[in-house]
UniProtKB/Swiss-Prot annotation:
Record organism: Gallus gallus (Chicken)
Annotated protein name in UniProt: Hematopoietic prostaglandin D synthase
Positions that bind glutathione: Y8, R14, W39, G49, K50, V51, Q63, S64
Family of the protein in this entry: Belongs to the GST superfamily. Sigma family.
Keyword Phosphoprotein part of the UniProt annotation: no
Keyword tRNA processing: no
Keywords annotated in UniProt: Cytoplasm, Fatty acid biosynthesis, Fatty acid metabolism, Isomerase, Lipid biosynthesis, Lipid metabolism, Prostaglandin biosynthesis, Prostaglandin metabolism, Transferase
Length: 199
């Protein structure tokens, strides 16, 4: 088993999908959390100057979704066939495209709040409708077992619902999928013990 070290801020953010995958697979890793004040000093030492990064026996992988895809493949959560893997990737990329619309780093709180409200009110319904249609009456987004696409929906929707609690009320199937993910024993245990952070 390789030695894993995941480095990110003390947030769920873009590293949480990786933490879900580690938790579900029962893989030991170092969850290294940076404090914001330390970032200017550390940033020049990080490849491409962004986190998260995953060190695998000293080899550094950057980009959160590249890390997550690697972990999903290693833990059997990428999809059972090449087509399933492509579909799971497509769902993750669709959700990620939406999450990238938000001005997460905006310092002006009025500007940030207005932008968030606009996205959640005017753009989120289309995403939720499309995800609901894709899920249909299936238990999981892709195939007959859970994949990292289901985890990514749970991770991202947790953040979205913290900003607009009734966001998915019209989509009980998507909410039920969240419940199924969070009922998985390893995920439930991780959610219970993880540090409580805003995002």
């Amino acid at each position: 088993m390789p030695n894993y070290k995941l480095t990110y801020f003390n947030l769920r953010g873009r590293a949480e999908i990786c933490r879900y995958l580690f938790a579900y697979a029962g893989i030991k890793y170092e969850d290294h959390r940076l404090e914001g004040a330390d970032w200017p000093k550390i940033k020049p030492t990080i490849p491409f100057g962004k986190v998260p990064i995953l060190e695998v026996d000293g080899v550094i992988i950057h980009q959160s979704l590249a890390i997550a895809r690697y972990l999903a493949r290693e833990s059997g959560l990428a999809g059972q066939t090449p087509v399933e893997q492509a579909l799971a990737d497509a769902i993750v990329d669709t959700i990620d495209d939406f999450m990238m619309l938000f001005p997460w780093a905006e310092k002006n709180q009025d500007v940030k709040e207005k932008a968030f409200n606009d996205i959640l009110t005017n753009k989120a319904p289309e995403l939720l409708k499309d995800l609901d249609t894709f899920l249909g009456d299936k238990k999981w987004f892709v195939g007959k077992s859970v994949t990292w696409a289901d985890f990514y929906w749970d991770v991202c929707s947790t953040t979205l619902l913290s900003y607009k609690a009734d966001l998915a009320d019209k989509y009980p199937r998507l909410l039920a999928l969240r419940d199924r993910v969070e009922a998985l024993p390893a995920i439930a245990a991780w959610i219970q013990k993880r540090p409580k952070t805003a995002i």
